[in-house]
Amino acid sequence: MILMIMALALVGCAVDNPALETEVQEANSSVYEVLIADYYNMVQFRLSEDVHMKLEQGEYYEISDTLEAAIPEEADYDWWCMFVEFPSGLTDPQVTDFGYLLKDINADGQPELFWILSDGRILALFTVWDAKPVLLGAYWPRSRVSVTEDGHLLVLGSGGADSQLYQVLQIPSNGEANILAEFGQDVGQAYQITDGKKESITQQKLTELIETYFEVETIDFSKEIQPLSP
């Protein structure tokens, strides 16, 4: 998942060709600039005083063709929930509460793009594959998303007071996120998902999985967040 991969052969030589690597990074930065502009417009629309009336009338914020193409169909629901809820938890939300971050989280030399709140909550994560941006995930503010030092994405989602889902994701260089571990509990019943199959587990096993995967050092992005601007 990563910045522009022009051809498979190109990827292999990028490490040994600093000039080519810089060229690829700059090209993908321009792709991200489009998404950052979309982000700013989305925040402006969502924070407008008459937003609820606009939504009731079927008026939505406009996004670029680039962003629209970056959101896979299966992510539509999560994207909409993120959009509706992202100001939650902010007493008096302003544009200054929102920022972005470019960070290479899988050590391939190319950064991913984070849409992130000033308090560190991650709203969305993008990468670039085949010269096009790809949405890796959109997250409700109630979710907790962090990145480990070894580049794994930790996602704690909630479907309610008694429903939690833990996911450990790896970000390879192919525009998709690989699930390394997935477990949680629903109405008090702990479970683990392996190869797409959901199986019940004990609370002790759930605790062990949480300790193994989630009680680890994560990266503090607070000093790297860039403010949104027109």
Language-model segments: residues:
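Beta-propeller fold detector
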Residues: L135-R142, N178-G184
